[in-house]
Amino acid sequence: MFGRTHYCGEVTDMAIGQTVRLKGWVQKRRDLGGLIFIDLRDRTGIVQIVFSPDVSKEALQVAETIRSEYVLDVEGTVVQREEGQVNPNLPTGTIEVHAMHVTILSEAKTPPFLISDKTDVSEDVRLKYRYLDLRRPVMFQTFKMRHQVTKAIRDFLDEEGFLEVETPILTKSTPEGARDYLVPSRVHPGEFYALPQSPQIFKQLLMVAGFERYYQIARCFRDEDLRADRQPEFTQVDIETSFMSQDDILAMIERMMARVMKVAKGVDISIPFPRMSYDEAIARYGSDKPDTRFGLELVDLSEQVKDCGFKVFASAVQNGGQVKAINVKGAADKYSRKDIDALTEYVARYGAKGLAWLKVEADGLKGPIAKFFTEDEQKQMMQTLEAETGDLLLFVADKKSVVADALGALRLKLGKDLQLIDESAFHFLWITDWPLFEYDEEEGRYYAAHHPFTMPVREDVPKFETDPASVRAQAYDLVLNGYELGGGSLRIFERDIQEKMFKTLGFTEEQAREQFGFLLEAFEYGTPPHGGIALGLDRLVMLLAGRSNLRDTIAFPKTASASCLLTEAPSAVSEEQLEELHLRIKDVQKVD
């Protein structure tokens, strides 16, 4: 019953005259009165099946009962299509299969949406019937690419001498980073495991163990607010290695990405990738993950305007802030006052109090703020911004962080709106020279910019107590087309530096020992210098497959509210289960 000679999408002219046996789903059925045509679909494509009384009356009778999405077993002869019947849009469009036998393996209800790449249905419906959504060819191709990417990574790392090692899913909760997903212990009442946010500590312990080269296609879990490129459970390519410098690690990852791009996209990319310091990325692009496929770089005018007649600019600089601008080439006529008002509202979302603007005309700068600048100041501004007639100049004056956030976001919006981005290009970039700490003004304390195990630049260690904000990290992020693919660093491997790190982050000695004592003790048994990286597999596939949503690269994803519409998880559990776990649920309001 289950013998198959060909896949549907692979029946070609070479098979003309042969008897083939196919399996698949009914994509479309057409009854032309005496003849029935069925498009049979499997994961490789579609082939046309013809049911004719001249070939088999029995098969034709069965075909009369067939409907969309029925699963069929068809045996027939491959025939050249008649002239005028060729379908140039199908790889199998020059042939058809004349059915001699057909068996209905499974019937189907009418699906809630058309199984087609062009289907127009809400994402909620697609996620509720995900098993139907995954039948669409575009979805299968995405997951085929995911498989190719994962295999290319595994093959490369195997050739480089890495071992794939699985680390625990049930582990210890730590307060740093995002919220943990907690798992109550039945055996230890009142105590909890946490699902891992990453295998970070375990992979470092594998370096202490002498494994030297480790990797894992790791499942990770973070209970954080979601957006289009975030999921509560995700997959990362987790890599750790001993006795390699930062340059060694970056060069190896570049070779790995070149392999991935060749396998998955058939393109050769140039290595080494460009490198840019964190400070330079913020200064030029207003972002630590800049999209370098287009220009519109930020230009600092603070020094030029600190004494100008426009008080908004002058006071911003005098109060320790910045004035930066973007020159939107040739856009003066493309943006009306109403359009600029919309841009002003847009930057307000990022904290900007306003968006100043000028248009470059043949006789000089025109706009609401032009009158505040002398002729010499206008000339100097135009020279700095390389402004020409027809350009639109957009300014934000505020705290440095607000200027970066607002103009960085505006730059991306303008790039998309003006179609300045080459969507076929792949621009990889390393961001290096990160700060080790970030200061949270609301909580009045420092956080690790990456994580608490990142090695500082050695000469900066004495600044832990005197000037933490100036301590540099031996850390690096890999960026692709404006998305952070992942981050890594050299790791702390000496107990005294790790203890100083915990102290700067606000841990008491007792807290550090309680949460990380096993790691601190391990560092006393001969720890090699080591480092690594973690790359987001879901996000990498999203970019390579040209998908706009991370959920399209995960077989059974969660919604923005971290729920599964297919299984209706999360869900309530029985009182008996709660009793076993020694838990009681407080009165809570259900979140829609």
From Swiss-Prot:
It is found in: Cytoplasm. SUPFAM superfamilies: Class II aaRS and biotin synthetases, GAD domain-like, Nucleic acid-binding proteins. One of its GO terms (biological process) is aspartyl-tRNA aminoacylation. It comes from Anoxybacillus flavithermus (strain DSM 21510 / WK1). It catalyses: tRNA(Asx) + L-aspartate + ATP = L-aspartyl-tRNA(Asx) + AMP + diphosphate. It comes from the Bacteria. The keyword ATP-binding applies. NCBIfam families: aspS_bact, PRK00476.1. Its EC number is 6.1.1.23. This is Aspartate--tRNA(Asp/Asn) ligase. Keywords: Aminoacyl-tRNA synthetase, ATP-binding, Cytoplasm, Ligase, Nucleotide-binding, Protein biosynthesis. GO terms for molecular function: aspartate-tRNA ligase activity; aspartate-tRNA(Asn) ligase activity; ATP binding; catalytic activity, acting on a protein; nucleic acid binding; transferase activity. One of its GO terms (cellular component) is cytoplasm. Its main location: cytoplasm. Disulfide bonds: none annotated.
